């Protein structure tokens, strides 16, 4: 073993092996073999020396090193060919820059699309899009179709990167924004590129028409093949132009641009079937090179950017297959169409629900970013037109109808009251914008961020209660029959509870909880959070009704005509009903888990370094920053859920019966909801079988078996179907 004792400034000999270096450089080398072996003998068998400089990062790098699946550098050892860059490949004649045949164009375009998608899925540009040599310098390309396509792909990458960076809802596992010094076609305007693509498209369309079969004419197979290939190339060029135009539309501030994007997405969707049916027309990648994970074909070199990659081992990039590419684009188009719908939503609550539902599909980083930038445009206005403060006021009006925001109330034009409410609303803007942004992150990061934002909502809750008290005092002096108690506080509490519920439920989706933890998670949800949520919703509904009564009395005083009373649908009634169903599902699961535990069907770990209390406190740690509702500590939970306080204490069969009643109650509540959506039908698919299983267990079915039950979360992410094994 040889160690360098002095650093040589001359780095020219990097590629030489050690003995040659020793001969050619003036560096003095010291043999440390014996010293190293002596030091090793001091360690016992199995002992390791842990240097303080060797942390988790270095440990992970050591694990990844030389593993072909994790160390991208290993790919170089598997190939014997010479790696050429664009200019070298052109000089060598291994790639064409003019007169590309249609199969070559189609194959290169398809592989470029695959690389683009692999980049959007979190890999680096150097390992994906820039493995296409044509993208390196489109100015050199003489073929008009290839040149326009290369510029189009660069522009798509550039605008997508800008959108994702601006939305800031990505983490290192989602997206790599580095461009490695490549030119992103900044010297050419977006309009010029779309114009070039349109010219190529028109030229292709003329060729498609000229090769089309005419009635009564015998078809030449070669002409038919050319027609199919022209159509395939035309579809791909048009798809590139449409996708680029959609991204350009999203950079405009006008809401009309979203409508334009919607129309273009319909066009893009229509082109996909033509792309799918013509995949076989393109040249295919050679087999047996670099394990087939990265296509080797004319114009592509997976190792060309190997030296640009960072010194830490980058992820091994596996380029997706062409068939998957079409499916991915199809899903992306559907997601972008969904993004366009957000501008039609009337209020902040609907927008928050929309963001939650959109996030549940685990969308890609590009569609998540487009949704964020569509919601809050550069000028910090919602959809580029509404002030966030006005959205907050509308949300308050629709939820609790606070007197201070009613034009018929004396406080509406009171300067002091106006200052109070305006200050509160301004303080609401940041937490609510952050909440919307959180729903743009991937599901795992969302949960972490929801835990942190609770602190901001706790501060807001405190302010809301103070503002409520001040406004109530002002109101009593002028309109004693009216109240302004807990209006703003109720609204903030509602959002805090929703965040807390979402935080706990997402743990099931992310598979964070062990089976033995289910019972206290479901207990906290059913006995505490959903109970608080229903009480909050009922209080908000009561505030709305009280305000409506006052408005009706004022109307009666002015008008002598009798008005027919219509039965009004309460705005919050559906949410109250859904909360009751969720509460029953959680209560049913809690009692099921307790009964399973009593029957010895829940495997518990032998706690050595932690305990149930430690785990419980870890699970609910983010709730400690919230004062309302007050957090339930472990000892409180044990006391409240203790069955021995009942006389006689319930046995497993009684608990199974109680659980079955909860599932039945949830089923009845959900079946009473008109116009049931997908969420309702999903919960019903869990409630019905669970009701039957609980009945069987209550009757003594598989009583002697100690085999743990199975929990199937495939139907619903938060409530499993219980299966007896």
UniProtKB/Swiss-Prot annotation:
Membrane-spanning residues: none
Cellular compartments per GO CC: cytoplasm; NatC complex
Induction and repression of expression: In carotid arteries, after mechanic injury.
Ranges annotated as biased composition (Basic residues): 558-571
Superkingdom to which the source organism belongs: Eukaryota
Expression across tissues: Expressed in primary spermatocytes, basal epidermis, interstitial fibroblasts of skeletal muscle, and intestinal crypts.
Region (Disordered): 548-573
Keywords annotated in UniProt: Cytoplasm
GO biological process, one term: smooth muscle cell proliferation
Subcellular location per the Swiss-Prot or TrEMBL entry: Cytoplasm
PANTHER family: GLUCOSE REPRESSIBLE PROTEIN MAK10 (PTHR21373), N-ALPHA-ACETYLTRANSFERASE 35, NATC AUXILIARY SUBUNIT (PTHR21373:SF0)
Assembly notes: Component of the N-terminal acetyltransferase C (NatC) complex, which is composed of NAA35, NAA38 and NAA30.
Function: Auxillary component of the N-terminal acetyltransferase C (NatC) complex which catalyzes acetylation of N-terminal methionine residues. N-terminal acetylation protects proteins from ubiquitination and degradation by the N-end rule pathway. Involved in regulation of apoptosis and proliferation of smooth muscle cells.
Family membership noted in the UniProt record: Belongs to the MAK10 family.
Protein name: N-alpha-acetyltransferase 35, NatC auxiliary subunit
Organism expressing this protein natively: Rattus norvegicus (Rat)
Gene name of the encoded protein: Naa35
